[in-house]
Amino acid sequence: FYGSLPDGKVKTFSRGGSDSTGSSVARAIHADVYENWTDTSGVLVADPRIIKDPVVIETITYRELRELSYMGFSVFHEDAIFPVRREGIPINIRNTNKPEDKGTWIVESTCQKSKYVITGIAGKKGFCSINVDKDMMNSEIGFGRKVLQAFEDNGISFEHIPSGIDTLTVFVHQD
């Protein structure tokens, strides 16, 4: 996909450009649904190159899909969710080669109880983890803030911060 800049130069979109374009058009025309046709029958619970025959997720929230996309799911670009989400337009990801498949519905919230405890599994390369272990860390007021302040002071943004009672891990891009 491509467009033109104000000076007339042709500009190709980055990865996810067609997702973002479709989402913006759906919002602009106040569509009832944004159908995104691709080469898979919806959002799968895992990468089929790693897990054999992964199940299609029937319904997922915008937030869940955004997290999974950010962490490596390539079926839909994470930023393309914003235009339709703001307008409450559901997304239906469908398979161009199997139009009879229902695909995956992406909605604001769902009252459906999932068949699974985990929505999906995603992975992304190029991260580094910094592990901090300290006994009684959980009782020290401001400990996490102090750790993050060190990153901020050095101009380093973080991606994810899981923690436990005595541990804190900060994930950052390796570049």
Where are these regions (language model features)?
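C-terminal catalytic "cap/lid" subdomain
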Residues: 1-175
